[in-house]
A protein has these predicted regions:
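Active-site glycine-centered loops adjacent to acidic/histidine catalytic or metal-binding residues
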Residues: 61, 107-108, 163-164, 199, ...
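N-terminal active-site segment of His-dependent metallophosphoesterases
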Residues: 10-21, 31-135, 420
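Histidine-centered catalytic micro-motifs
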Residues: 267-272, 301-311
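Binuclear metal-dependent phosphoesterase catalytic core
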Residues: 87, 190, 291-292, 310-421
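Short, solvent-exposed loop/turn elements at domain surfaces
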Residues: 64-70, 205-208, 330-331, 357-359
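N-terminal chloroplast transit peptides
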Residues: 1-8
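Short acidic, glycine-rich surface-loop motifs adjacent to enzyme active sites
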Residues: 253-275
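Extended active-site neighborhood of metal-dependent phosphoesterases/phosphodiesterases
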Residues: 39-48, 76, 114-260, 285-300, ...
Length: 421
């Protein structure tokens, strides 16, 4: 594991923990890579003792199905385990409801089945599916909905976004059961002058939107403008994007937040920046979306997403983009996290396969990095490095972790965050 210093347009920290100005600011096509973390900055790896402004529970891609486990390359899919994993996750969130503003479901609550034509995966006619497939989708979706209703305490709001697998039942059924309003995207007011914008990245994909709708037409026009090679790499039929109507709404909400002096967190199923998930797994027009966010980085601070099961992260400009590791594929048994929001930073405390991350949201925040220890990690190792300074820092970190962290959570937790890349 390589321990690194953060790099961002806020400036890079030197060995004394003092920002040094970076004259080579990142462009939309080229971003600076992090440099090696020096031992001199180890004093910055202190515990977080202050309380957050508020905390959000987050999980992604539970993806239940009543079928045998699957594999994809070296990854495992624990379909039947998903119900128990979701139940345990929501039970813990409920136990900590006093410390949570809400819980975010980042999409793909269940796996679903379809009878789509393999010849044109950008087209879907769900009305032609067999009654058996339709009934199976409704049954398994309802089983997961029941878990959310029984496991999550009534005074803790569940906020959901639409995932591609969620479209195996109709859009209207999903929205009704998951307590959406009229729209597929919406705003949630958070404490302490923060706002959560919940987006729909199934938008713009003709497979998932109403035929001949404006989003359907826009999606077809966008696909027609791209080469087959581009579509093969970057426009997978199980993804989507943000069409014009939704994008205009998004801009209005960000402008309003900016005017009111509020900060914004964005959640969606597909990641919203190139590099924050694997190629083909981000939103189709992620380059346009992220460029806009970077122009509003005084207001937009963090974007969280699911969809790409191994997870991911990138910082573009001063905006952090986090892809949460899938609950479905967690070999250790689970994956979810607590997103703590502070005045100058956000900290994702991961449980199970979910990586912990510290993200600086102003020049006064601690440096950005990631950690993967949570409740299951042993000693920290240094991989692909013979740097004695890195070895010393890793040893120092290990000394702080001799007592395993508890999986329980409270707003008073002060577990050390181990910074690595």
């Amino acid at each position: 594991m390589i321990l690194v210093k953060a790099s961002s347009s806020f400036g890079e920290e030197d060995v004394d923990g003092i920002n040094k100005d970076s004259s080579s600011s990142s462009s939309s096509s080229s971003y600076r890579q992090p440099s090696n973390q020096s031992l001199g900055a180890s004093s910055r790896l202190e515990s977080v003792h202050k309380k957050p402004l508020f905390t959000l529970g987050v999980f992604a891609d539970a993806q239940y199905a009543d079928k045998e486990n699957g594999t994809y390359g070296t990854r495992n899919k624990y379909f039947r385990d998903a119900k128990e994993r979701l139940k345990n996750c929501l039970n813990e969130f409920s136990e900590n409801a006093h410390a949570l503003a809400c819980v975010i479901n980042l999409g793909d609550l269940y796996d679903g089945y379809n009878e789509d034509s393999a010849e044109n995966l950008y087209f879907r006619d769900a009305s032609s599916w067999s009654e058996e497939v339709k009934a199976r989708n409704v049954k398994e979706f309802n089983e997961m909905v029941e878990i959310t209703e029984k496991s999550l305490t009534k005074d803790l709001k569940l906020v959901s976004v639409l995932g591609n697998h969620d479209m195996a039942v109709t859009r209207e059924v999903f929205k009704q059961k998951m307590n959406f309003g009229e729209d597929d995207y919406y705003k949630v007011e958070l404490p302490r002058n923060w706002v959560l914008l919940c987006l729909d990245t199934t938008d713009m994909n003709p497979r998932y939107v109403e035929e001949n709708s404006e989003a359907w037409k826009e999606g077809h026009a966008w696909l027609a403008s791209k080469t087959e090679e581009f579509k093969k790499r970057n426009a997978k039929p199980w993804s989507g994007g943000i069409a014009s109507v939704q994008f205009n709404w998004l801009k209005e909400q960000v402008d309003l937040a900016e005017k009111e002096g509020k900060k914004v967190i964005v959640c969606s199923h597909n990641a919203l920046a190139p590099g924050s998930a694997r190629e083909g797994m981000v939103a189709w027009n992620a380059d346009v979306i992220s460029s806009y966010f970077e122009s509003k980085s005084e207001t937009v601070k963090v974007c969280v997403a699911g969809h790409d099961h191994p997870g991911g992260y990138i910082q573009r400009g001063n905006v952090h983009y986090v892809t949460i590791e899938a609950m479905l594929e967690a070999d250790c048994g689970t994956s979810y996290g607590y997103l703590e929001v502070y005045e100058h930073e956000c900290i994702l405390r991961g449980v199970g396969a979910c990586k912990s991350r510290r993200m600086r949201t102003s020049e006064w925040g601690r440096f950005t990095g990631i950690a993967n220890f949570g409740m299951l990690t042993g000693d920290i190792d240094v991989i692909d490095s013979n740097d004695p300074e890195e070895e010393k820092l890793a040893d120092w970190i290990n000394d702080q972790l001799r007592t395993p962290s508890s999986a329980s959570f409270s707003s008073d937790d002060s577990d050390d965050l181990i910074i690595r890349r």
